[in-house]
Every structure is written in C-alpha cells, then in structure tokens.
C-alpha cells in the first residue's frame, strides 16, 4: 500500500518528495525544497537536511543537535501558506506552519524561510518568525484565531 507524503500534498510520497530526499532529483523551486526538508525531519534524515542547507551556514556542525531533536519530536503536519520566488532572482521565500509534539506537548513552528539558488540548486538559508496578533486568523488556514490554534 502506498504512503501519502508527509508534506501534506495529498500525493504519494514516492511521487512527491521521495525523489528529492533520495537524491534522484533536485528540488525545482523553494516550495518543493521546503516540503522535502519537512519530510526529512519526519523521516529523521539529517544528511538531506545538511545537504540542502546553504554551505555558508555550516550545517554539518548541527548534526548532533538534529539527531537529538529527532529523538524527542514527532511531526504532525505541514501547511504552506505563502510562497514567492523568481528563478531570475535566485532567491525565494516560503511561509509555513509545521506542527509537532515534543515531550507530550504540542507546538508549531511558524516561519518565513529564505532560499538561495546557486549552480541550479536551491538551498535553505535561514528563516524569520512572523509575528501574529492573538486575535488574528491563524496562518495555518484552520479558520480559528491564532491564540486558539498554533499560537497556544
């Protein structure tokens, strides 16, 4: 039986993010890279995460931290709510909510990730955490207020 991709695309993993995580293909744009990196977190694949971080970030030094995080975190879902890039600019952004449980507590990472394209490959550079008011609609698309959803 086929497994749906953890990235939330509703497509089989083998047809969605697996070709990127396995190295068969290079992610064609920042959104595909973001989704495949989320899958790597779900599947505890530190090698892919390090390979897709921009070389200037020194991600190899984060291997132990990544491995420790894998042991305590269960990823529950990804919602991409905004993306923008132009291949001519070689820079792109993807905004998302990644839900997880850690130590029995649920949480969410809300980030606007920045990506850079070099030599035909997109890399994750860094991210910022956008600020939402407690009464703003939650960016995950649930229809709830932020304070009653991902802002808890």
Swiss-Prot record:
It comes from the Bacteria. Transmembrane segments: none annotated. This is UPF0225 protein YchJ. PANTHER family: ADENYLATE CYCLASE-ASSOCIATED CAP C-TERMINAL DOMAIN-CONTAINING PROTEIN (PTHR33747:SF1), UPF0225 PROTEIN SCO1677 (PTHR33747). The gene is ychJ. Belongs to the UPF0225 family. SUPFAM superfamilies: NTF2-like, Sec-C motif.
């Amino acid at each position: 039986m086929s497994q749906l991709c953890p990235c939330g695309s509703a497509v089989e993993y083998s047809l969605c993010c697996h070709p990127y995580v396995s190295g068969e293909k290079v992610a064609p744009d920042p959104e595909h890279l973001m989704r495949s990196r989320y899958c790597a977190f779900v599947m505890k694949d530190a090698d892919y995460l390090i390979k897709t971080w921009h070389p200037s970030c020194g991600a190899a030094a984060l291997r132990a931290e990544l491995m420790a995080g894998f042991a305590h975190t269960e990823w529950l879902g990804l919602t991409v709510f905004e993306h923008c890039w132009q291949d001519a600019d070689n820079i792109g952004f993807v905004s998302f909510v990644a839900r997880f449980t850690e130590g029995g507590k649920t949480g969410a990472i809300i980030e606007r990730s920045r990506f850079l394209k070099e030599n035909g490959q997109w890399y994750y550079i860094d991210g910022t955490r956008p600020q939402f008011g407690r009464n703003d609609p939650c960016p995950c698309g649930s229809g709830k207020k932020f304070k009653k959803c991902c802002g808890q």
